[in-house]
Curated annotation (Swiss-Prot):
Gene Ontology CC terms, in alphabetical order: endosome membrane; Golgi apparatus; lysosomal membrane
Protein name (Swiss-Prot/TrEMBL): Transmembrane protein 45B
GO BP annotations, alphabetical order: innate immune response
Phosphoserine, modified sites: S273, S275
Matches recorded under PANTHER family: EPIDIDYMAL MEMBRANE PROTEIN E9-RELATED, TRANSMEMBRANE PROTEIN 45B
InterPro entries named in the record: DUF716 (IPR006904), TMEM45 (IPR042127)
Keyword Phosphoprotein in record: yes
Membrane spanning stretches: 7-27, 49-69, 95-115, 117-137, 149-169, 183-203, 215-235
Domain of life: Eukaryota
Keywords (A to Z) from UniProt: Endosome, Golgi apparatus, Immunity, Innate immunity, Lysosome, Membrane, Phosphoprotein, Transmembrane, Transmembrane helix
Any Pfam family: DUF716
């Protein structure tokens, strides 16, 4: 959808998943830290399956929104010797590949004894690459600011595709996972930024899309967005660490208390048995 909602919708999807990853991966990392066996528990596998289902649901919602809005193509690709709403079709194609990625996530953890390890990462990398590929040819013959604000997103997309591809070999690498998370959060916030710049809501004045100062500001703004994404990842990582440390200390305190009660009970029993003998 070539409007504000058409950019806010995917931006919200990517932002939700990115925020979830910024909590999930630190939890997973600290849980497995120090353990010899990195195999996922049943509960963790269930979470991965649910995440795949949610990704697939987001993709279906996105496709339906692109196709069946009032001015959408309604599944018509070619009509009366001309293409029908190709921009909506490009967005639908992007959602389609992320839906396939969600399905592969579910298949990977439902049939882990059959599916080769790393195939879920391959499909996710492919989905991100396809998104970047579509965006590269999405803005030809557009005003300079429109082209520039979309092209900036390509750096994050292709960077994420390379990072996810490395995860096929270096699976469960916390650095790569957090890097991918930061780029996904960046992608989510930047979709919102594109919507505000190209389709200003609430009756705000439109941006001059040929003004070089606007292009310079948007470039700087992209860097700020990524800094915010990194801060979000760092803050959530720290919060997860503090939370788990507190839970661990409380659990250790309870264990020490139980052991102390047991030792006191044993000592009292010994005293009683000694007095009985006397």
């Amino acid at each position: 959808m070539a409007n504000f909602k058409g950019h806010a919708l995917p931006g919200s999807f990517f932002l939700i998943v990115g925020l979830w990853w910024s909590v999930k991966y630190p939890l997973k990392y600290f849980h497995h830290k120090g353990l010899k066996n990195n195999r996922l528990s049943r509960q963790q596998e269930r979470i991965e399956i649910i995440e795949g289902a949610v990704k697939t649901l987001f993709a279906i919602i996105g496709i339906l929104a692109e196709q069946f809005v009032p001015d959408g193509p309604h599944l018509h690709l070619y009509h009366e010797n001309q293409w029908v709403k190709l921009m909506n079709w490009q967005h639908s194609t992007m959602y389609l590949f992320f839906g396939v990625s969600g399905l592969m996530d579910m298949i990977t953890y439902l049939y882990f004894h059959i599916v080769p390890l790393g195939l879920d990462r391959v499909v996710l990398a492919m989905a991100v690459f396809i998104e970047g590929f579509l965006f590269y040819f999405h803005v030809h013959n557009r005003p300079p600011l429109d082209q520039h604000i979309h092209s900036l997103l390509l750096f994050g997309l292709f960077g994420a595709a390379v990072s996810i591809s490395l995860e096929v070999i270096l699976r469960d690498n916390i650095v790569l996972e957090l890097f991918r998370t930061s780029l996904l959060i960046l992608q989510g916030t930047w979709f919102w930024q594109i919507g505000f710049v190209l389709f200003p809501p609430f009756g705000r004045p439109e941006w001059d899309q040929k003004d070089m100062d606007n292009i310079m500001f948007i470039t700087m703004c992209f860097c700020w967005h990524y800094l915010v994404a990194l801060c979000i990842v760092a803050i959530n990582y720290s919060l997860v660490y503090c939370f788990l440390t507190r839970v661990k200390r409380r659990a250790e305190g309870e264990i020490i208390g139980i052991q102390k009660l047991k030792s006191d009970h044993t000592y009292q029993s010994a005293l009683l048995s000694g007095s009985d003998e006397e």
